[in-house]
Regions:
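Long, internal low-complexity/basic segments
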Residues: 1, 50, 140, 202, ...
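Beta-strand elements within well-structured catalytic alpha/beta cores of enzymes
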Residues: 7, 11-14, 18, 25, ...
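Residues within well-ordered beta-strands of beta-sheet-rich folds
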Residues: 19, 24, 313-319, 372
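Histidine-centered active-site microenvironments of extracellular/periplasmic hydrolases
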Residues: 27-120, 203, 208-213, 279-284
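Glycan-recognition/cleft segments
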Residues: 328-349
Length: 372
């Protein structure tokens, strides 16, 4: 039920806000000459909930498994403000019908394909029609530029711009049978990779969305081949019957991967969120101390010390009023994971919240006296 309620709420919200935007443009007298491009969806449904679902999605992002027993303890709270639940993967697969896979599986249309609506009365005469030419999100910028009769920028504020990839979709607006101009496209995420070319799709499913580790090593992956012209949902693997075509597509993927800096391929998952583990530049890299002042709140995690799984020392200058102090001194995170240093009944207390599954606190015996 939660799955359908959430979808219904999103649909109503989107409909309302799009209606407001359209109404404002209509009042300006520019509705017929305004290009509306509405992409419906978010690269498939989310399967991170695994086989049983989650009461706190942050457990997934921290690589911590939830057991059914863990979740049953929250059965009466499920869906309320004390949980941050995620549906089971079965719901995600059902939501991506007729495709086999979900978000994160960039090598399947279930993890990439979305509907799109274009509205531009002065730009084309067709109404209520469907276009089937292959297209990709990188086609949107060229489409907008052509519709507005603008050239692709060669530089912005003195910075030379890389050429915009993709092909404008304007050619298809008044010609449903026009040959597709976007004929080749690579896909890759977490080692899940594919290449589309002239109606054929070669792909690898390397890592499942709910799994901590890939299925195999990258070098041991098995490729599949599909003819999307007759197999919309990628249901029939024809690699065995077309070995030469599969080899051609594999070589083409490698060419595109090199050209678009996909290599070296990184099939890690959660580790890539942590800059120190991922090996990428980090604003706070090497910092061992940080000074904060009163009023500094709602700071992004990227501008705070990474203290995960580390011992830390917190030194706080506080002024305790007469009658005792109360309240938070420093906190990171919240209900679904984090820690806090605060005064409770005047006593310094440190609390650690392990992803909502376990809470630990240490409290001083005596309250702080008044003064600094």
């Amino acid at each position: 039920m939660l799955f359908f309620v959430a979808g219904s709420m999103k649909d109503r919200y989107h409909t309302l806000e799009i209606g407001r935007l359209g109404g404002a443009v209509r009042e300006m007298g520019e509705l017929d000459n305004t290009v509306f491009i509405y992409i419906v969806g978010d690269n498939g449904t989310s399967a991170e909930g695994g086989m049983n679902g989650l009461f706190n999605e942050y457990t997934y992002f921290n690589g911590v498994a939830e057991s059914v027993a863990d979740m049953l303890a929250y059965v009466d709270e499920w869906g309320g403000p004390t949980t941050y639940p995620h549906m089971a993967a079965g719901w995600a697969v059902a939501g991506d019908t007729p495709f086999a896979w979900t978000k994160q599986v960039a090598s399947d249309f279930g993890g990439t394909r979305n509907g799109m609506v274009v509205h531009w009365p002065k730009g084309f005469a067709a109404k209520g029609q469907v276009r089937t030419q292959f297209s990709h999100v990188i086609d949107i910028a060229p489409t907008v530029l052509e519709a507005a009769s603008l050239p692709q920028p060669s530089s912005v504020n003195g910075t030379v711009q890389a050429p915009i990839q993709g092909a404008s979709l304007v050619y298809s607006f008044n010609d449903a049978k026009a040959p597709a101009r976007h004929t080749t496209q690579y896909f890759e995420m977490f080692g899940n990779r594919a290449i589309y070319h002239d109606g054929w799709m070669a792909r690898v499913v390397h890592k499942l969305p709910w799994a901590a580790q890939p299925i195999t090593k990258l070098a041991d992956d098995t490729w599949a081949l599909y003819d999307t012209r007759s197999d919309f949902s990628l249901a029939n693997d024809v690699a065995a019957a077309n070995p030469d075509k599969l080899k051609e597509r594999q070589a083409l993927f490698l060419k595109e991967a090199i050209a678009n800096r996909v290599l070296p391929m990184d099939d890690r998952g959660i580790e890539r969120v942590n800059a120190a583990l991922a090996g990428r530049p980090d604003l706070m890299a090497g910092r061992t101390s940080l000074t904060l002042h009163s009023g500094m709140k709602d700071m992004s995690e990227n501008v705070f010390l990474n203290i995960k799984n580390k011992s830390v020392t917190i030194v706080a200058d506080v002024e305790v009023p007469a009658g005792g102090g109360e309240g938070v001194i420093l906190a990171q995170g919240g209900r679904f994971g984090g820690w806090s240093l605060y005064l409770k009944d005047g006593k310094p207390t440190y609390s650690y919240n392990y992803l909502g599954m376990q809470r630990s606190s240490v409290t001083a015996q005596d309250p702080l006296p008044a003064g600094k």
